[in-house]
């Protein structure tokens, strides 16, 4: 087996391919990507058999920015007979590790998603057949590998597997979040998704705790502030625009009509700084770096708006500059970045300061 499939946002295949090429080269696992614009996935073909499995073990999924999911896979199965689609798939999975879950998926395009109704119907008979052949355990298990069947067209699919300690836990790599009817804007889902992706669920009570203070730069009308308020935090909302009255009525929000680049909290008791400003990405990244280095906040989640061209290069440059700034200032940190499902022409970055710094 020498293919890895990576799901991505349609239109970002080139960035996803460039990133996986860089990561594979660093691991000295050589191959090349195959992409088609707006298909929502990338096929990376390794020169050596077995390198696909090595890659999905050695490459931390959490450090891939543009990939929503990755799994090692067979080459594309085509022309599955309508009267028996199961047998060719069972043949393809010979030699796979025994898996604890089956996901029959499609890429995230309108064309492919038309197949989802079929995928749902096909799941039960394929799961039964796989359990009969001991390809799947008798009971679903979140500790065992995940078996992926990805249909890109009727009768055409990739069959592969991922490891649960190094994949996306979500079907199709997409968290299913419901828009809260009382939220002031749909941007609220970006921050909610970021919490799901960047912060382990068992740490939410400690790191997203009631009573904490947060700062939201470029807050109006309050989509990101809403997420902090919902978790019983207090928020400094920074913007020259108008905040949703429903948020102001909670008594948890202090509004400051000032420029987000000039605001400094009077009391340095802030845990979270969040920012979704429409600004040059390098400028936003540097501002977030300053907040953390000065210990004005302990954790940050912010969006970097991407240019029309050279998106991957811009991301690499901004993140590298930010890391170097932290290193230069002697700050220990943890940094993750992801092109989230609810992001468009932007990526979301999370940084956590790991040392006890005094505000200055």
UniProtKB/Swiss-Prot annotation:
Its EC number is 2.1.1.186. It catalyses: cytidine(2498) in 23S rRNA + S-adenosyl-L-methionine = 2'-O-methylcytidine(2498) in 23S rRNA + S-adenosyl-L-homocysteine + H(+). The active site is at residue 305. S-adenosyl-L-methionine binds at residues 187, 220-223, 239, 259, 276. It is found in: Cytoplasm. The keyword Lyase does not apply. It comes from the Bacteria. GO terms for cellular component: cytoplasm. GO terms for molecular function: S-adenosylmethionine-dependent methyltransferase activity. InterPro entries: RlmM_FDX (IPR040739), RlmM_THUMP-like (IPR048646), RNA_MeTrfase_FtsJ_dom (IPR002877), rRNA_MeTrfase_M (IPR011224), SAM-dependent_MTases_sf (IPR029063). Signal peptide: none annotated. Keywords: Cytoplasm, Methyltransferase, rRNA processing, S-adenosyl-L-methionine, Transferase. One of its GO terms (biological process) is rRNA processing. Pfam families: FtsJ (PF01728), RlmM_FDX (PF18125), RLMM_N (PF21239). Belongs to the class I-like SAM-binding methyltransferase superfamily. RNA methyltransferase RlmE family. RlmM subfamily. NCBIfam families: PRK11760.1 (NF008734). Monomer. Catalyzes the 2'-O-methylation at nucleotide C2498 in 23S rRNA. This is Ribosomal RNA large subunit methyltransferase M.
């Amino acid at each position: 087996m020498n293919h890895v499939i990576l799901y991505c946002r349609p239109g970002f295949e080139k960035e996803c391919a460039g990133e996986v090429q860089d990561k594979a080269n660093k691991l000295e696992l050589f191959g090349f990507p195959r992409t088609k614009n707006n298909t929502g996935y990338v096929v990376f073909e390794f020169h050596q058999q077995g390198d696909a499995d090595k890659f999905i073990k050695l490459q931390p999924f959490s450090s891939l920015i543009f990939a929503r999911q990755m799994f090692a896979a067979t080459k594309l199965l085509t022309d599955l007979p309508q009267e028996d689609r199961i047998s060719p798939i069972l043949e393809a999975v010979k030699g796979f590790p025994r898996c604890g879950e089956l996901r029959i998926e499609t890429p995230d395009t309108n064309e492919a998603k038309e197949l989802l109704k079929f995928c749902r119907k096909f799941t039960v008979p394929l799961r039964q057949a796989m359990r009969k052949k001991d390809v799947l355990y008798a009971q679903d298990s979140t500790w065992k590998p995940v078996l992926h069947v990805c249909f890109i067209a009727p009768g055409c699919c990739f069959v592969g597997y991922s490891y649960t300690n190094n994949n996306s836990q979500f079907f199709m790599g997409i968290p299913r979040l419901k828009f809260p009817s009382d939220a002031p804007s749909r941007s609220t889902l970006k921050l909610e998704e970021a919490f799901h992706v960047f912060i382990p669920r068992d740490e939410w009570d400690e790191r997203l705790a009631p009573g904490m203070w947060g700062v939201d730069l470029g807050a109006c009308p309050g989509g990101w502030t809403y997420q902090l308020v919902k978790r019983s935090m207090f928020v400094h909302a920074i913007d020259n625009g108008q905040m949703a009255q429903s948020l102001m009525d909670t008594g948890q929000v202090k509004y400051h009509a000032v420029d987000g680049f000039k605001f400094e909290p009077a009391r340095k008791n802030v845990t979270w700084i969040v920012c979704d400003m429409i600004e040059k990405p390098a400028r936003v990244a540097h501002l977030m770096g300053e907040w953390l280095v000065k210990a004005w906040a302990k954790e940050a989640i912010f969006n970097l708006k991407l240019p029309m061209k050279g998106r991957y290069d811009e991301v690499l440059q901004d993140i590298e500059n930010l890391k170097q700034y932290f290193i230069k200032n002697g700050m220990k940190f943890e940094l993750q970045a992801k092109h989230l499902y609810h992001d468009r022409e932007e990526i979301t970055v999370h940084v956590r300061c790991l040392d006890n710094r005094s505000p200055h």
